[in-house]
């Protein structure tokens, strides 16, 4: 098309030049600029142009002159405008789907032979539009965390596609992960390529919401009929420094008008006057504010309150202040209740889960093991003296004392104690190294079900699952095989405090982090058969300098089918 128009411009210019030379002074000519570009016909009823001695055309009633050269320029400009107004070639739509579910797979990389890299959006779509290749056959290498394409005869994992503007093709990949990657939850361009090819998308704001292009670890809770979401450090497009004081948002519950969790989450961000997700928990002191616990509890008057534990952080990731806060519904931000002693042995940290048993009604805080609890009232949450830790230390002692609580027969005793620190994996490792206890004596002795290799759980959550009739833990491994903080595990126990014995790997990210994973129990489907979990996908701590465009430093949602036979953990 472009070449044809350029040829036409050149021919028109040459014709105009010749006609201008042939027009005699004082003659009447008709210039008809139309599809046939007829020139020089006498016509009294049409537009009349008279040639003067200087070979200028002047309209009978006009007040300005146009030379043949100027008319040529006008014609060139008009056609150039038309050329520029022609829409660009439509992109070629490539959809990468899971070969078992036929659902589009996000974050699959397509790489050409000469290194053009493209990543599927949350519909599994890439909009390919590359000048020079729009009518060629192109080979794409196909790769993505937890998924793979079959090898061809030469060992290449990829596929040849005949590119045609506006056409489409599908590439199938096999899922290696047990968990299924669904979509990116935060950031910009979640459905970028879908928009470019005209595919329907589920989100109200599929390209940019709250000016958020990156968000760290999530905390959420159901409060007054909605889901409240809060994140750590958050990036914006306008400047490298973003929001370091807890941006937040709300969304509707799926059963109350919200999206089905298999489709996405429509966030309504709390925004500032510029439209950027604003601070909701800015506490005094230098450095960022992070929320480490979020829970909904009723006070003595029966009023539901949204409560949080926060920390202040300075380099290098040192917590120098800690406190409790309550959400102000009118201001839509947290207000400090009071400070906590940074060195206090029992503080709420981690994702909250409520449980009532013979001991009473408590809120437990899992990080990832639920080793701290407090009575399930707003007043108790705000009283540091009410917190208890699950520990094998003697009451009132510190870890450095290494005083193990044992019965008369020397058997180690774990129990809930006040003013005594919990013994989680890091503390347990120190006691084992000091010869004070053995790993088998602890309720926390998590190992790979298949290899019996020890699994060090770093961050995660624990919730009751009605489908499995057990407590289910989702946790990321510290010092995993493929990445420092990128391998996610599934474990279950009959008791909230364990014993936690066997785990199954459900997600792998090759040399990439996926830290602070969290199950979202409000999204459970089919009685808990399907659970939904998300985490922070980032190259931070991974040693990998290659950050995935748009996806890096954002939350990614996965779905896990608990009826999958690969998840069976024998009861012991």
PLM segments and residue spans:
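Short, ordered, surface-exposed loop/turn motifs in non-cytosolic proteins
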Residues: 90-92, 100-114
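A short, solvent-exposed loop/turn motif at the edges and junctions
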Residues: 133-160
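Beta-rich carbohydrate-recognition and catalytic domains
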Residues: 166, 173-213, 222-287, 296-346, ...
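Short, acidic Ser/Thr/Gly-rich low-complexity loop/linker segments typical of extracellular
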Residues: 115-130
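Beta-strand-rich domain onsets/edges
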Residues: 80-92
């Amino acid at each position: 098309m472009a070449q044809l128009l350029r040829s036409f411009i050149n021919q028109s210019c040459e014709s105009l030049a010749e006609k201008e030379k042939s027009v005699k002074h004082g003659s009447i000519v008709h210039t008809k600029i139309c599809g046939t570009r007829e020139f020089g016909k006498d016509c009294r009823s049409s537009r009349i142009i008279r040639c003067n001695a200087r070979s200028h055309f002047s309209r009978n009633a006009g007040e300005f002159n146009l030379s043949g050269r100027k008319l040529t320029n006008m014609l060139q400009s008009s056609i150039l405008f038309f050329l520029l107004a022609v829409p660009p070639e439509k992109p070629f739509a490539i959809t990468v789907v899971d070969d078992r579910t036929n659902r589009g797979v996000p974050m699959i990389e397509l790489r050409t032979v000469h290194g053009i890299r493209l990543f599927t959006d949350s519909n599994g779509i890439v909009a390919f539009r590359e000048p020079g290749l729009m009518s060629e056959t192109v080979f794409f290498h196909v790769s993505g965390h937890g998924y793979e394409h079959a090898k061809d005869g030469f060992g290449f994992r990829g596929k040849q596609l005949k590119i045609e503007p506006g056409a489409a093709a599908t590439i199938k990949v096999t899922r290696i992960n047990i968990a299924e990657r669904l979509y990116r939850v935060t950031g910009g361009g979640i459905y970028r390529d879908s928009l470019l090819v005209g595919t329907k998308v589920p989100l109200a704001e599929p390209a940019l919401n709250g000016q958020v292009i990156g968000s760290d670890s999530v905390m959420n809770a159901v409060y007054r009929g909605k889901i409240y979401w809060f994140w750590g450090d958050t990036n914006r497009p306008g400047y490298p420094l973003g929001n370091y004081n807890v941006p937040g948002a709300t969304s509707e519950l799926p059963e109350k008008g919200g999206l089905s969790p298999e489709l996405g989450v429509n966030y309504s961000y709390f925004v500032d006057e510029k439209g950027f997700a604003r601070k909701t928990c800015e506490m005094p002191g230098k450095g960022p504010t992070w929320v480490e616990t979020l829970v909904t509890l009723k006070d003595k008057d029966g009023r539901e309150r949204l409560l949080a534990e926060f920390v202040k952080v300075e380099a290098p990731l040192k917590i120098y202040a800690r406190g409790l806060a309550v959400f102000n519904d009118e201001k839509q931000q947290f207000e400090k209740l009071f400070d906590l002693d940074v060195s206090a042995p029992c503080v709420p940290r981690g994702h909250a889960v409520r449980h009532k048993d013979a001991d009473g009604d408590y809120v437990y805080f899992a990080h990832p093991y639920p080793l701290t609890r407090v009575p399930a009232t707003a007043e108790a949450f705000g009283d540091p003296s009410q917190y208890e830790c699950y520990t094998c230390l003697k009451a009132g002692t510190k870890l450095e004392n290494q005083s193990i609580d044992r019965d008369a027969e020397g058997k180690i005793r774990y129990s809930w104690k006040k003013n005594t620190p919990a013994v989680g994996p890091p503390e347990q490792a120190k006691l084992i190294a000091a010869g004070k206890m053995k790993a088998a004596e602890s309720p926390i002795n998590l190992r790979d079900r298949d290899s019996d290799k020890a699994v060090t759980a770093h961050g995660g959550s624990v919730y009751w699952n009605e489908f499995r009739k057990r407590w289910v833990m989702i946790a990321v491994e510290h010092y995993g095989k493929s990445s420092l903080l990128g391998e996610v595990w599934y474990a279950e126990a009959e008791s909230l405090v364990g014993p936690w014995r066997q785990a199954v790997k459900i997600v792998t990210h090759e040399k990439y982090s996926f830290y602070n994973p969290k199950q979202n129990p409000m999204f459970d489907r089919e009685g808990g058969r399907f659970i939904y979990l998300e985490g922070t996908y980032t190259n931070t701590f991974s040693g990998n300098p290659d950050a995935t465009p748009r996806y890096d430093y954002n939350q990614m949602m996965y779905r896990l089918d608990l009826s999958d036979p690969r998840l069976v953990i024998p009861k012991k």
